[in-house]
């Protein structure tokens, strides 16, 4: 069985523990983080779990951080062939055209956005200029989706992006609306042909999984990916939980590897 964990966060060692604990506190997680987001730790847990690849990223909380983070992610991916690098942008960042070209030239094809921590809405007008450029360059967007406490990243914020840029492939993480898994809110987004999702911080987060299975059925079955949300959750434990889900074997195989391998057409995985 081959596995891609396409939702992992990494941080430089000097800030990893602080960043992870702050995230855990913000989301009021039901249990302490399993890990702290260092590269060495992720490499070890991937080997232990038998996971073949991990997409790695970190969101810039200011325009100043964009280039530093993108170069950090690239440097780690160049050292670890099982890492798939994913970049970041920020609404205040002005040099986005040049930075997107730099990313593409260095084999980075995705952009991670986390509106809650970046302090702008997913559909901020400034971001539309960046999404347009990403679409032109055959790049993809992966966004944290949902927070019942603040309305900056729910399905209604990704819907206009996916509709305006039909060739921009958009990954709506956490089944499309973390913490507010209302199928009627998610369905209009999930049915769009350029929208994908992952199961990170969803099935593991709630006890009543019935609504989540209903949401899962809204998506094209080939548009669903496995992600652990490391370091908040342990990839090995999340993989085991995924194997125990009430999902047909062939569909589960797609979620664990084939779907993202097909999605990530830039190189053979």
Language model regions located:
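Mid-to-C-terminal alpha-helical segments outside catalytic/metal-binding sites
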Residues: 1-9, 13-53, 220-223, 232-269
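A generic "structured core" feature
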Residues: 3-11, 103, 130, 171
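Conserved, mostly hydrophobic/aromatic
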Residues: 7, 46, 73, 103, ...
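Active-site environment of divalent metal-dependent phosphoester hydrolases
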Residues: 10-14, 61-64, 91-95, 118, ...
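A general structural detector for well-ordered alpha-helical segments in enzyme core domains, enriched
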Residues: 41-45, 69-76, 99-103, 126-130, ...
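Active-site gating/metal-coordination segments in enzymes
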Residues: 52-53, 61-142, 147-149, 191, ...
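Catalytic pocket-lining loop regions of alpha/beta-barrel enzymes
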Residues: 109-110, 123-225
């Amino acid at each position: 069985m081959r596995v891609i964990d396409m939702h992992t966060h990494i941080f430089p060692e000097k800030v990893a523990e602080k960043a992870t604990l702050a995230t855990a506190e913000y989301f009021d997680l039901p249990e302490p983080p399993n890990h702290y987001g260092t590269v060495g730790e992720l490499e070890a847990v991937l080997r232990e779990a038998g996971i073949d690849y991990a997409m790695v990223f970190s969101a810039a909380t200011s325009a100043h951080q964009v280039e530093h983070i993108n170069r950090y992610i690239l440097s780690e991916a160049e050292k670890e062939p099982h890492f798939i690098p994913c970049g970041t942008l920020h609404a205040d960042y002005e040099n986005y055209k040049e930075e997107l070209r730099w990313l593409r030239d260095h084999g980075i094809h995705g952009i991670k956005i986390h509106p809650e921590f970046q302090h702008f809405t997913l559909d901020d007008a400034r971001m539309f200029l960046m999404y347009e450029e990403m679409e032109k360059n055959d790049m993809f967007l992966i966004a944290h989706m949902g927070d019942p406490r603040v309305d900056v990243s729910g399905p209604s914020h990704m819907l206009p992006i996916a509709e305006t840029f039909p060739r921009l492939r958009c990954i709506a993480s956490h089944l499309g609306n973390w913490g507010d898994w209302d199928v009627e809110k998610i369905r209009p987004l999930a049915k769009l042909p350029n929208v994908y999702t992952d199961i990170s911080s969803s099935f593991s987060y709630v006890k009543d999984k019935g609504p989540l299975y209903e949401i899962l059925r809204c998506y094209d079955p080939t548009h669903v990916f496995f992600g652990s949300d490391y370091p908040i959750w342990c990839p090995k434990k999340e993989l085991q939980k995924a194997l125990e889900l009430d999902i047909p074997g062939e569909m589960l195989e797609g979620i664990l590897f084939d779907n993202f391998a097909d999605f990530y057409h830039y190189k053979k995985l």
